[in-house]
């Protein structure tokens, strides 16, 4: 075999072997060589969007998954590692508009290219289970389950104020609005009333909350979901009024309902605020154009609580009053831009003395501030300059200035207030959730068609919204549409749009809204288990699910992970599956970072420069003092921007394909595993990549130099080992023990460190007549090194394993047994201690491993450095540090 490390030839040969033998194709209920059923292990990365090319975040994610899958398979597990494509969504439509091609063509072309990139990475993917969510064979089951959910009332249609993205021309779920802007377009979100379909995820709020307890997920992710679900215990009650509508009927039966977690502050209410869409606001605006204009202004912007919390609080008095239920005082009603109609009853009570938002609102509009709770054992006098002291805490406050509730603790007051209001028939204790139902209707083309047919029109209601019969599924999306940016192209496709009503047979129209793409990603991992199933899932799903290990970015903590958990529980309730949670364990890999550089124009406009185009000026210690563009003679100033996440916007990404072409996939894999633990951020380093390449070259050159002797050696160890062989095996098996521990902890960076230590131990050994190490012992040690390295660098190790003759006895490296630590090899008969005289190192001392303190002292005192220093005299003191050193004080 060649001693030159040719990564292209090596990786091509390995991949050809894997393709020819289809080694990554797995089946259910696999057995080992002895006929015993293997334990299953399902390890899966979050499926990618086929954007065109892989980025380094993909490389890191999939390499982590691959390392895990390969090592577990060698340990005897039946491992499933599938891959698919989250193929619907707006980017494909935008690309289609820009390139004047159908989104389908753009998507499938990207899938083909990215699949080649994954093959080049050497990933152990079972491609027989590949899924693309834009395939009718897949999304028909989105439609089928939608109809089942419709039957059960889990899916329903309603008109509601929603987040509207004016650029993408579609509704956004709350989770898809970030800082008041659309998560894809970045446009400022508007409020609109629009009909659409919703999933009743709020009915599962308590299950979604309690189910987190048993999951092996990062606490940070659990906390994010807990906060998003937002369980609150409080009191829902009503302020009475006699405000009538145009027909003379009291609006909402004369009751303005609010919910509060701080019913102990009810006596401090000085105003109520309602949402712009509230019936009382509409009534007040009928003859008040100024208020009407303010209401319209409020209807622009996000309907996200987090966004409302940071925007300036604005309001306008309606001229209306409601009656306080306990004091009978008149309470003014205001329209507030911070009140959501979709949250609770669309109204809140205002207690300025004990709520930061209400306090700011009251100061701005000169509303009364009434203190009604006080800190225990302190002066109850409210001071407006120290309002923070009176904000709502629960543990150390009592009611004050609250009549019959004076002196009651928070909990006592809440229960008493709730009881009084319940007796009056206008209040009750209630548990609420911040979580809102999931709106799935999107006014876009490239998505799963919602299987509904609309019969009738405004003049003739007809049959209304009629579900598509199950036999007519899937409702196939025409793939030849080329969007032009002027709305949903499905509205222009008569062949899709026009259909007969399934109930009455009269002309009708298909629903042209498509489903939120998070529907697609809510169950794809189950379809992997049986992509050819004639039902949504089959028995294979019960074998593989729930998933043992899920891997993906923490940015999906709320959106995808919450929806997937909800979807799983719905499928359980429909008796399609028997498990409650989809993902038993979750690993959230850290981001990949790189340096950023930019040039800045006089106007302040920044042009981001790729790090490969920048040359650094370094001082004598290698620290950057400045930067310049390579080959730039004009002296354009280059500013060092610091280390940030790799992104297109900062132009600081590294092309994985270029990296593989130059160094090989094994080098790329080794670097991303060695540079940082999986959960931590990884800072890109060109020097680190070079170092990874040098290490692999050393492995190849050393192994190939010893290959001929090792290939002919026996697998069985000699019956008697010499001291050098014992010491070599002790070192190698000690390193193996640490590597096994690190593999178990998923600390792959220290696994690579262990392999490097092992190579350092082996490299000095050159088999030959003068070598104290036999070929059989080195054969064992090298087999351990190759197996420890294999999950991380599968190409090089696969070829070496084969060329050095290991496969003849152990079979393919993928299915070779994981090396077992020989505990007897770790037993030392002799250890080496540092010998010090008067605290200065004077040599080494070999002593029996089980020697007592007295025996060690005796051996040390007989050593040449000791006898010379003592010159026949006795030592003043002898200090023994077990396992490390002995110090003789002369």
Swiss-Prot record:
Catalytic activity entry: tRNA(Leu) + L-leucine + ATP = L-leucyl-tRNA(Leu) + AMP + diphosphate
Entry keyword Aminoacyl-tRNA synthetase: yes
Biological process (GO), any one: leucyl-tRNA aminoacylation
Location(s), subcellular: Cytoplasm
GO cellular component, one term: cytosol
Entry-linked InterPro entries: aa-tRNA-synth_I_CS (IPR001412), aa-tRNA-synth_Ia (IPR002300), Leu-tRNA-ligase (IPR002302), Leu_tRNA-synth_edit (IPR025709), M/V/L/I-tRNA-synth_anticd-bd (IPR013155), Methionyl/Leucyl_tRNA_Synth (IPR015413), Rossmann-like_a/b/a_fold (IPR014729), tRNAsynth_Ia_anticodon-bd (IPR009080)
Keyword field: Aminoacyl-tRNA synthetase, ATP-binding, Cytoplasm, Ligase, Nucleotide-binding, Protein biosynthesis
Motif ('KMSKS' region): 645-649
Residue positions of motif 'HIGH' region: 48-58
Xref: Pfam families: Anticodon_1, tRNA-synt_1, tRNA-synt_1_2, tRNA-synt_1g
Transmembrane segments: none
EC numbers on record: 6.1.1.4
Molecular function via GO: aminoacyl-tRNA deacylase activity; ATP binding; leucine-tRNA ligase activity
Statement: the UniProt record of this protein carries the keyword Aminoacyl-tRNA synthetase: yes
Domain of life per record: Bacteria
Binding annotation for ATP: 648
PANTHER family noted in UniProt: LEUCINE--TRNA LIGASE, MITOCHONDRIAL (PTHR43740:SF2), LEUCYL-TRNA SYNTHETASE (PTHR43740)
Family: Belongs to the class-I aminoacyl-tRNA synthetase family.
NCBIfam families associated with the record: leuS_bact (TIGR00396)
HAMAP family per record: Leu_tRNA_synth_B
Name of the featured protein: Leucine--tRNA ligase
Organism, as annotated: Polynucleobacter asymbioticus (strain DSM 18221 / CIP 109841 / QLW-P1DMWA-1)
Organism classification: Bacteria, Pseudomonadati, Pseudomonadota, Betaproteobacteria, Burkholderiales
Underlying gene: leuS
